[in-house]
Every structure is written in C-alpha cells, then in structure tokens.
Amino acid sequence: MESSGAGAEDGLMETNPRRPTPDPLPDVIIDTALQVHRDLGPGLLEHVYEVVLARELELRGLKVQRQVPVPIQYNGLHFREAFRADLVVGNEVLLELKSVEEVSRVHSKQVLTYLKLMGLRLGFLLNFGAPLLKDGIERIVLGYVPRSTRER
C-alpha cells in the first residue's frame, strides 16, 4: 500500500497550518524593554531608552537598527528621510519609543503609518514614561482592527 503524503513512517511530522509556530522575537523585545524600564525607571529622555534598549537587544544577539529612515513616494517625488523610526529589530519589528506622561492616538497612528511605509507587519509603541511599562506597551499589527472598533 502506497501513501501519498508524509507521515510518521518516513520520520516527517505534519504541521497544522492553522497553528503557526509562535515567533519568539516579540517576547524577547518586550522582556528586554521591561528589564530596561525596571533598571532605569521612568522619567529619562526618549533617546536614553533608545540607546540602552538597542544595546540590550544586541547583547541578546538581535540585529537592531536605530533611527531608520522611513521613505515616502508620491507622484514621482521621493522623500528618503521624511520620518525616522526609532528602532527596527531583526528587519521585521518596528519599535517607536516615547517617554511621556500619556500617549495619544496620534502616536499609534504614527506607528501604523511607519509600518505601511516600511512594508512591515508588527510594531510596538513603548512608553517609557509610564510608571509601569506594562501599562505603556501597545502592540500594533498592520491590517488588524481591534474588535471594539469594528463596524457591527
């Protein structure tokens, strides 16, 4: 009897396409950001958190780019450095850092715009000005609309 698919007999495991393997990168980023905030506390300038977080992520073996140009093209015009993203980790996750008392909707929209312009899917808005960083983390996924804002 012949088998048309891979199975346990040939040592291959089948994967469930509905359950993708979780990406550990976001967890490493958040754990590192939480540690930086615990060590430094709130109240410093955004630039300090950017430098320290980039360094800590690099020490964990991740590729980190700082102040990454966000290009814009419009009707033949090319703006190569119209904006700058604070950090891009592993060429796939954008980090926008703030050190403010409270973030506003415009900050979230900024991250979403950067994701679109850079062709990335996942970003985090990290507010190091929050007393507890866990309260200052916003995960932003391009194309995801939170249930509370969907039309019914």
List each language-model region with its residue ranges.
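Active-site beta-strand-loop-beta-strand hairpin of nuclease catalytic cores
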Residues: H78-R80, R84-L95
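Acidic pyrophosphate-coordinating catalytic loop
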Residues: Y74-R80, L133-K134
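A short acidic/basic microdomain associated with nuclease active sites
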Residues: E58-N75
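A short, surface-exposed helix-loop junction/capping segment
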Residues: I29-R38
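Nucleic-acid nuclease catalytic cores
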Residues: L94, K98-E151
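Nuclease catalytic cores
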Residues: P22-D27, P42-E46, E50, A54
